[in-house]
Amino acid sequence: MMYEKTAEHFEQKYKNLPEGHLLVNLGPSHPATHGILQNVIQIDGERIVEAESVIGYVHRCFEKLGERYTYNQFLVCTDRMNYVSTPLNNIGWILAVEKMMQIEVPDRVTYVRMIISELSRIIDHIICTGILGVDLGAFSGMLHLFHHRENIYQIIEKLTGARLTTTFCRIGGLEKDIYPDFVKEVKLVCKGLKPAIEEFNSLLLKNKIFLGRTEGIGGISAENAIAYGYTGPNLRAAGVDWDVRKDEPYLFYDKVDFDIPIGEDGSVLHRSLVRMEEMRQSIRIIEQLVDGIPSGPWHADLPHAYLPEKHKVYNNMEELIYHFKIIMHGVKVPPGEYYMATEAANGELGFYIVSEGEKSPWRVHVRRPCFWYYQSFAELVRGGLLADSVATMSSLNVIAGELDC
């Protein structure tokens, strides 16, 4: 089991290596791992004979904290899972709680949540595909997209007050309403992203070295991908047409028009192609929404659940009482078992919650998508070259904060 993978475990298992074989540590502190991940790899020359993955270096007991924190407080933990696209985590948790409480939010809230979700998805895919190019020596390609990533971060920072740990959304609505130039700036970002994505796509797909390092590398069949629990772009790259936004719609995803890109062999190349097309589809979704954001309130009228606005708390006794009760006594969720899944940037992010009607959950379990990808890493790289393992790891988009949770 994972917790048994100590130095003694590896010393015992690999003490009688065949002549010419070496044991190599890829991580836990290595640029190619993009986080605190450890892969112990047995190689013969440059060929990988065996590999084992070790997790837990940044385990922070989030599920246990979920049993101590109130439903509002746990939102800060979701920030620190997949920290590349935190609003997607925030929205997933809030939707789970709203499902438990059968809360309906105004349409304005849903529109803004969807726009921010797709902007966050684009950021995540820029990081994943851009860093893959860097790992393979194609540094300049990433720079074509990072300028636009920064523009998206500026929008998110203006809206939420933070770039990474956004703590975006509240039970029943948003933390605050969108700012006056929000629509204009989102449209400008989308306009600039379109040619940048095509240029980046051209830089990689017309590069023989990139194609040689990714085509047919780290592939997985559709059957094995399903068996390992793959979801998201990695599953679709293997040829499986499954996207929570289409197959189990939430928010207003059933009311917008977009396509689901599907790969064939689940290789590094096809994972990259799927993510590039998903960026185009995210822009398509945003453009259908941004001009139609309805007017109206940016939160439901729920004194028992929605934290009141600060200026009202400071000037109105009734609002101060509501604020005190929500902070001190928490939001009371009906007893029962609930599961809510959303399509995060790297796959199906699910929250399983057991409530006993108290201010804190009795049990919280997070279905983090990259946990399942990492279990398959040894199978993907076995028999391949050591250099190819770096590309494979990068294309899986394993985020250490989410993996260990």
Swiss-Prot record:
Localization (cell): Cell inner membrane
Pfam families cross-referenced by the UniProt entry: Complex1_49kDa (PF00346)
Membrane topology recorded in Swiss-Prot or TrEMBL: Peripheral membrane protein
SUPFAM superfamilies in the record: HydB/Nqo4-like (SSF56762)
InterPro entries: NADH_Q_OxRdtase_suD (IPR001135), NDH1_su_D/H (IPR022885), NiFe-Hase_large (IPR029014)
Any coiled-coil regions, as ranges: none
The enzyme's E.C. designation: 7.1.1.-
Entry annotated with the keyword Membrane: yes
GO MF annotation, one: NAD binding
TM annotation in the entry: none
Reaction(s) catalysed by this chain's protein: a quinone + NADH + 5 H(+)(in) = a quinol + NAD(+) + 4 H(+)(out)
Leading EC class: translocase
GO cellular component, one term: plasma membrane
Keywords of the record: Cell inner membrane, Cell membrane, Membrane, NAD, Quinone, Translocase, Transport, Ubiquinone
Family: Belongs to the complex I 49 kDa subunit family.
Assembly description: NDH-1 is composed of 14 different subunits. Subunits NuoB, C, D, E, F, and G constitute the peripheral sector of the complex.
UniProt xrefs under NCBIfam families: PRK06075.1
Primary role: NDH-1 shuttles electrons from NADH, via FMN and iron-sulfur (Fe-S) centers, to quinones in the respiratory chain. The immediate electron acceptor for the enzyme in this species is believed to be ubiquinone. Couples the redox reaction to proton translocation (for every two electrons transferred, four hydrogen ions are translocated across the cytoplasmic membrane), and thus conserves the redox energy in a proton gradient.
Name the UniProt record assigns to this protein: NADH-quinone oxidoreductase subunit D
Naturally occurring in which organism (per UniProt): Leptospira interrogans serogroup Icterohaemorrhagiae serovar Lai (strain 56601)
Gene: nuoD
